[in-house]
Each structure stands twice: as C-alpha cells, then as structure tokens.
C-alpha cells in the first residue's frame, strides 16, 4: 500500500510492468493523462481527461509513475483520429488525438491552475485561449536530425517519443508544406552524394541536422546544413542542386557544431549561397531573419499575440517603452507605431544588429537598440534619466533573471506586459515582483 507522512509520498502504490485500470482526472503540462491512486500520480501519454483506461506501468519513481496506454474502456467525446500517419511514433506532436477545441480549453485550464496555486492570484482573470482557423502547416522553422539506422540506411525526420531514434518521414502536418518537398529531395541528395552522417554516440561523422526557415508571407527559404566538421563535403554540388531545384531558396548556410551536446546549432555560420538572411512580414513590418535569430514560429498567431500586447500596453503616443529580451526587434517595432520612444535590449549582439537593420527597413526612427544584460542596460538607462511608462517582457523558457525582476520593481513602470512561453515561470516571477 501507499505510505504517506506529512503530505509526502514515501513509496509507490504501483509496480513496474503490472496492468491497472483507472480514471483519467487531469492533464500534465505535456498533455499526458493523469491517473491517481491515493494521491500517487501516474502519467499516461495519449490518455484523455475523463476516460477510463487500462494501462501498463513502465517506470516507477518516488513521486510519480509513467504508464503505457493499453485499452480505452470509456472514450472521451473529445478524442479524435490523429490525421498524421507518423503520430503514434513521432515525438514532434503530443495532442493530435485530442480535438483542437479541447486543446485550447486544456491550455486555459493549465494557466488557471497555475495562478490558483498562488493565493494572492485567485482573482486573476484568465481569458479563453485564442486559437487558429486552420492549425496545420504553420511552422516556419524545421529542425531535422539526420542519422543512420542499424542497416546503414539514411534516416531524416524527427525523433521518436522519449528517444533520439529518428522517425523517417516525408511530410509533416505542422511544418510549412514547402519544407516537405525540400526535405525529401535533400535526403535523396545526401544518399546520392554518400555524405558522412554524424553518430552522436561516437561523436564521429559529418552531417548532424538540416534546418529550414521560411518567411511565411514572403515564401523565402533558408537551408542550413549543421555539421560536425569545419568543411561541408560536396559543397558545390549541394549548392548547385538546391539553387537549381528550388526557386524559393534564397540562402544556403553552413553551421559548424563540434560540441558533444544536444544543442542543435554551433556558434559559427557561413553563407554558401545567396543572402545572409531571409525576410518575413508581420502586419506592415518587414524583418530580416538570420540562421540564429529568434523569430516566432507561428506567424498568424504572432500577429494576434502582438496585437493583444499592444492593446494591453494602452499606448497614446506619449509613452516611453522598454522592450526587454527584444530579440531582432519584432515587438518593439510593433509598439513603435503608438509610442513616443522604444528602448530595446537583448544579450545577443547579432540580434541587436538585426534589430537596428529592421528598424531602418521599416523607417522606424523612435527606437534605440542596445546589446547587453537587460538588468545592466536598464540600470544604465535609468541613470541617464530614461523613465519608462511601459515595460515589455518576453523572456526565454527559463524566465527572467532575479536581478532583472529587482530592477523592474525599482523602475516601477505604470504597466508591465509580460509575454511568456512558459506560464509556470511567469507565475513564479509575478509572485516575486508582487505585481
């Protein structure tokens, strides 16, 4: 049985490899179904809230277990047939078995629950999730690992669930359709040229990843070859094939990553063909995007997101804005139309160079961009007499630095608009700031 001491789970109530039946009562943040036996949670991928399921326990930990779905005894009305033929093996998507409307509701409920855990946030208003009319083929960036199977055959696709084994695919339901065609033809090229393929276990071989970036509205595509070597073998043949085969490819780049790491890209890139960047558009603004630039992967949703951020900023043209973690200046540029002045700060110097160039392209004259740590640059601006009415925050998944939070409190702007790709860190930091 389960032993509980002062609210702490001391031992598991389930055993590995045994089969159990249970009711799914919730979702994890990854979309897995949650079954509980006497408060002990078992996470079951592909199970849906309110379903009764039979599952086999495949992993047991002190605080939780992992189950494999065997049989659905009572099926949820929200269960749908996944449209992708690779869904059951590919690790790229987790929720195609759940109706899109239910996915939106699940995301809202997860945010609601995060805020409920903070007692002083109980009255926070959480609006409905804003979805898409057609939630397919929206991704403007594909990061495609390349490998070999045990028979020595080239595999090019995405990783299997919870592994680094590659699922060989020729199309993806969520990436730009142009990427499907490029992916298939590049695989044939790799086979024809007999390119050396990287083996992550031995840290030997050449080609690690193919990365594709496409401007959603312009159609311009960049192809990036990530290698474990300083040189790209058969470079001229690769350039000749891709440039003649695809009219939309305006940039071919070589990125060098020699690290024993799961990090996909290295620090050094070379332009082999065409432009250094591609161009895309958000609303009336154009942006140049390099191989390493952070750029939102869902352009139609990004326009909705930035429009909502602009609404929440409540600008009348007299405000000074600080855009922290500004990247290549997308949000700051969007805000500049209704602000007195925008100050953008970003730790990546190349991104700031892109932001300055993008400001010139869009004839934005009321913006200043500076490279450095947000908390340090903002303190410098403060000493220079810059007092923002609005601060925009869009940090990476790990959230904001604690020093930045303290700096933000000291600034005491009238409004903070916090865009987050990780609600858990957002709630944590709002609590730290006592907003």
Residue locations for each model-derived region?
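Terminal RNA-binding accessory module
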Residues: 2-82, 86, 376
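Short, acidic/hydrophobic/Gly-rich beta-strand patch recurrent on exposed beta strands
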Residues: 33-38, 157-160, 224-226, 355
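Hydrophobic beta-strand signal
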Residues: 54-56, 143, 322
């Amino acid at each position: 049985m389960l032993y509980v001491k002062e609210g702490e789970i001391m031992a598991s109530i389930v055993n590995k490899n045994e089969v159990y039946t249970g009711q799914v009562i919730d979702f994890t943040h990854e979309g897995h179904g949650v079954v509980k036996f006497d408060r002990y949670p078992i996470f079951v991928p592909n199970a849906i809230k309110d379903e009764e399921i039979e599952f086999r326990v495949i992993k047991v930990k002190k605080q939780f277990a992992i189950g494999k779905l065997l049989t659905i005894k009572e099926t949820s009305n929200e269960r749908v047939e996944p449209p992708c033929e690779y869904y059951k093996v590919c690790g790229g998507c987790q929720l195609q078995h759940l109706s899109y409307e239910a996915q939106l509701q699940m995301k809202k409920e997860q945010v609601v629950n995060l805020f409920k855990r903070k007692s002083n946030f109980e009255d926070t208003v959480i609006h409905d999730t804003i979805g898409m009319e057609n939630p397919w083929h929206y991704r403007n960036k594909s990061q495609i690992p390349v490998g070999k199977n045990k028979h020595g055959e080239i595999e090019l696709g995405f990783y299997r669930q919870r592994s680094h084994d590659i699922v060989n695919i020729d199309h993806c339901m969520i990436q730009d359709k142009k990427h499907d065609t490029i992916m298939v033809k590049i695989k044939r090229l790799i086979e024809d040229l007999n390119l050396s393929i990287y083996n992550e276990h031995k840290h030997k071989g050449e080609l690690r990843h193919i990365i594709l970036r496409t401007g959603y509205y312009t159609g311009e595509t960049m192809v990036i070859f990530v290698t474990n070597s300083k040189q790209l073998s058969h470079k001229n043949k690769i350039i000749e094939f891709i440039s003649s085969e695809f009219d939309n490819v305006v940039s071919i780049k070589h990125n060098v990553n020699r690290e024993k790491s799961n990090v996909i890209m290295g620090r050094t890139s070379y332009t082999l063909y065409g432009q250094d960047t591609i161009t895309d558009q958000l609303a009336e603004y154009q942006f140049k995007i390099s191989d390493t630039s952070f750029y939102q992967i869902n352009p139609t949703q990004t326009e909705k997101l930035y429009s909502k951020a602009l609404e929440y900023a409540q600008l009348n043209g007299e405000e000074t804005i600080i855009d922290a973690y500004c990247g290549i200046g997308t949000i700051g540029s969007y805000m500049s139309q209704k602000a007195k002045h925008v100050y953008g700060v970003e730790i990546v110097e190349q991104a700031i160079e892109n932001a300055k160039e993008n400001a010139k392209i869009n004839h934005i004259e009321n913006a200043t961009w500076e490279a450095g740590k947000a908390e340090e640059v903002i303190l410098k601006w403060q000493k220079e007499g810059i007092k923002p009415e609005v601060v925009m925050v869009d940090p990476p998944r790990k959230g904001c630095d604690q020093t930045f939070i303290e700096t933000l409190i000291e600034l005491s702007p009238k409004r903070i608009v916090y865009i987050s790709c990780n609600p858990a860190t957002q709630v944590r930091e709002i609590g730290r700031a006592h907003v």
